[in-house]
Each structure stands twice: as C-alpha cells, then as structure tokens.
C-alpha cells in the first residue's frame, strides 16, 4: 500500500507483516524528507514507526482511544491519520502542528506538549468508559524519560488499584537504561506466563482453593504470598516493579519487530485489568546519524539528509542567550564551589550541557521532575549551597506550588533561570513562555528580573547569586543582541533599579526584558513622526523601580508598557497598579500578549500577528493616543492574534 493512500488508520487492518514493513519504510522516508526541510522532532518519531503500525493493527480508532505522551513522537501517527498531504506544512503557520491537538484531527484523542500526562488522561477515558458501560480500548504510550515524571507515577499507582478496569500502557523504552537484555529467556518466560494453559491453571487453582469449605471463600495469605512469589520468578526485575503496583507486565520486546508486537498487543487487550507492555526501541531508527547521536537529533533545524549536518544559517548570529548563560555559569562555578546548576532533563536546551562537560561535579539532572527540582534546590539552599535551576518558562509552571511553599515562604536563596521566556515559535501554545511574569508577580519574597541583552544577563546572574533570597531571571529563545561580553568581573545590579535609555517629553515607554531593544526602535519610529519618547529599561519586575517611573509618568503624562508575556497580571498591569496606588493617574497603554493562546508559527510571524513588531507598536501607539493630541483613556482593540 502507498502511504499517500492511507487516510484512515483502520486501513492497516488486514495488511500482511511484509506490507506493514513497507509502510514503515515509506513513513521514515516522508518523515526524514519533511523534517530535513522544515525542522522538527526527528529521533522520537523515527523510533516508534513499527510500534505505531503494530498497535494500530490491533485497534479500531473510530472507537478506541490512544494518548501519546508529549506528542513529539507522533509524526508517524499523523502520517497515517489523514495528514500525509499537508505534512510538508509541519510546524508552519496555519499548517500541521508539531504536537497533537484535538482540534486538528479526531484521531488526536488528547493534546499534549509537556511530558508525563498520558497515563492520567488515558485512565480518565477508561473510567468514563466504565461508567457509561461501553467497551472501547484505552491506551497510553509513554517514553522511559517521561515515566520519571511524578504525574505518570501517580497515575500508575491509581490504575493499579483498579484491577477490573482494562487499560493498556505501552512503555516506549528508547534509552535501555531500565531494560534487561532482550533475549530468548525473556521471550520464553513471557510466552509461558501469558499462555492460555498457564492462565487457566492459575485461575482454576485459585478458584478451587477458595471453594474449599474451611477456606471461607478466601485465599490464605500464605498461598497468596506463594502465588505472588512464583509470579515474580517469571518476570524481569523491572517488570516486578509494575506487577507490585497492580499491572500485568509483558516484555521487554523488540519495538521494531512488528509481528511480535502485534501478537503481544492482541494478548494484552484480552487481560481484564491494567497491563504494561514494555517495548524497546532505538531512537532515530533508520537514519544512521540520528541513531549515532540520539540527543543531538532529538530535534533538528533544517539539515542536509546526505550528511546529517544542519544547513548553514544566513549570516553570522550572536551567541544565544542560553549559551551565554551556560558559559557564564561555568565561570561562576569555577570561582565558587557552592554554586550548583540544576536541570530537569533539559540540559542542552538551557545551556547546562556546557556546565555538565566543564564542571560535572557542580551539575545535577533530576529528570522530568520539575516539582522535585525546585524543592531539591530549596533543600540545598538550606545547607549553604547556591542552586541555579535552569528550566523552560513553560515547564516551571508545573512547579508553582513548590515555588510558593518551599522557596518563597521560606525566603530561600534559589536562582531560577527561565529559558524560552516569551514567544518561542513553532512548538505552539504548549511551549510559549507567556505566563511566568504573571505567576511570579504573585509570590512574596521573590526578586524578578529580565535583561535587555546578553551582557545584562551576565550581570543579572551575578546579582541573583549574591542576593540573599529567591531570585528569578527570564531569558528569551534565540540569539542575543550582539553586544560585547565580559569574560569575568561582572558587577551586580542594584536591586529594583531601572535605567533611562533615551529621553523625550511626549511619551514614556517602560519596557521589560526582550522588549527593550524593540522599544528603542519604536521610539526612533515615533520620533520620525514627531513624537519624542523617554524609554526606560525596567530591568526588574519585583521590585518595580517606582522612584524612576512615577515622577516621569507624572511629568510626561502618557505611558506605554511593553512586555513579551501575557497582559493579564503581567508587567504592564504591575506598572498600572503601581501608578494607581500612588494616585499617579495618567493614560496608560499596555502592549503584550492578549488573553489568548499563541499557535505555532515562526517567532516573527507570531509577533506580527500579535502586533508586537516595532512598526506595528509605533502605529498602535499613535492610534491610541491620537498622535500629538490629548491622549485617550480608551484603547484600541489589539490585532487579531494566532489562537487555538
């Protein structure tokens, strides 16, 4: 069958193993063709091609439910659920999303982007099924990395206490860190244990013992213990863990052997309770460069298929904020042995991979465990260490309670570096870092800041480490401004002090973080229109520099705030509240992300859709304040933005 003719996963039913293997080959070819051109997640999807086909061979996706954890491995799923023709629009504005979205396809049964949610969601579907008296199958597919997440373990614990609820978890183990060898012994034990005769004998013996008059219908504790011990003898050590939690364990099996997986899934569907099928796959399967470097090819920008090398970018770019942070932290760690970098399975994305190589003894990776990472850092701070937790803005929101309960309330000196703060682009609404300003504003004791460029980032990192309390620093995705950097000798900033970058008497612009350079360009455009603006680099969200902002706002009389974050409870709201509390009642226009989601597109396209480019902001400001006439208190509606 030609992949282009596959518009419904049920078309896989009845295909021979050879035909399924040919479909797998076509999926890999299309996957590589598109990702090498447009960029995206590469290794995860290549590793689950056979798993996807084998699983869907045993399901009716018009009725059954499959929840893919995270969703970055679901490109094969998309290719066989009616999106083959549009797959070349992957992660592009208006095109196929890089993750699963319920609004994109009826076969995307649950949306995601963050790890470890699949088991809870699929179990919830199974609970709803049981309550309605229906009979569709519910499956969660989760990777071994995501299984380290607390919510996944909580869901397994819950499912194990529902012995009569049919429910399947497929563990996609592509690391082999928790797997024993896949071999004949495992195959034999698995086949024997789950064969019909063994199941019959086991059930029959138990029923016969319970029927004895003197047993009272109960299995003696000694016999129950013996039965459990005998069961564990036939299960690999990792499987015994799941068996103890109430699951029937099958595996490990070869995740690229379609025939064997089909047989195993068919058997699993017949079990009347929770089942975990342990499948061992190779991340990047079928593309040698991705198999050899599974971390580097997890996700890729556009690359040359023949060499595996990224296509050269247009012009030389300044180093990214992440790289500047990582290199600066290395030097600070070398100067102070109490400084420790912490990541939650995102070392490469945050720049901490540099620290891992340079000063490994001052580096910790806790896995996908954001809540644990925050409280671990709090405990370290109690004992005199200076933990620096580098984490994506969107992932830190998973640990909001820990920020308040374990760090904020106790006023502990923990530094949080929120990478990918603001608009991130093609990963879409699950990954936009638009909420950290709002949620950090609400936590007492925190000092919160954002740099205007990479040099100010260096000074802010030093400021955080010298501060005797919790501090948070937000940095954007992508390259810096190209300003000169110091190799050492960074001076800390005065807490809560902003700076004036240019002066004018017609308008006051107060900008935060990545919006400061854009504010300066906007001020130049306004000056060309005859409007002279004062621009403040706020630097700090908490505490806000009221001594600088209030007198200028009172004198100039018109204020604009700029932020790359949610307007609801954001930086602009902080400025407005501060002015209002001190009876500085001046017209204020807030520019930022309105109350909506930001869909997948390039960062530039997202900013254009949100009205956040300098040209657009200049025009919006002039419209709002009616050029040079008396400012209006009534703002114009923000431009229509990308939303889901």
Curated annotation (Swiss-Prot):
Mg(2+) binds at residues 144, 174. Its cofactor is Mg(2+); thiamine diphosphate. Pathway: Metabolic intermediate biosynthesis; 1-deoxy-D-xylulose 5-phosphate biosynthesis; 1-deoxy-D-xylulose 5-phosphate from D-glyceraldehyde 3-phosphate and pyruvate: step 1/1. GO terms for cellular component: cytosol. GO terms for biological process: 1-deoxy-D-xylulose 5-phosphate biosynthetic process; isopentenyl diphosphate biosynthetic process, methylerythritol 4-phosphate pathway; terpenoid biosynthetic process; thiamine biosynthetic process. Belongs to the transketolase family. DXPS subfamily. It comes from Prochlorococcus marinus (strain MIT 9313). CDD domains: TPP_DXS, TPP_PYR_DXS_TK_like. SUPFAM superfamilies: Thiamin diphosphate-binding fold (THDP-binding) (SSF52518), TK C-terminal domain-like (SSF52922). Homodimer. Thiamine diphosphate binds at residues 72, 113-115, 145-146, 174, 287, 370. This is 1-deoxy-D-xylulose-5-phosphate synthase. SMART domains: Transket_pyr. Catalyzes the acyloin condensation reaction between C atoms 2 and 3 of pyruvate and glyceraldehyde 3-phosphate to yield 1-deoxy-D-xylulose-5-phosphate (DXP). It holds the Pfam family Transket_pyr.
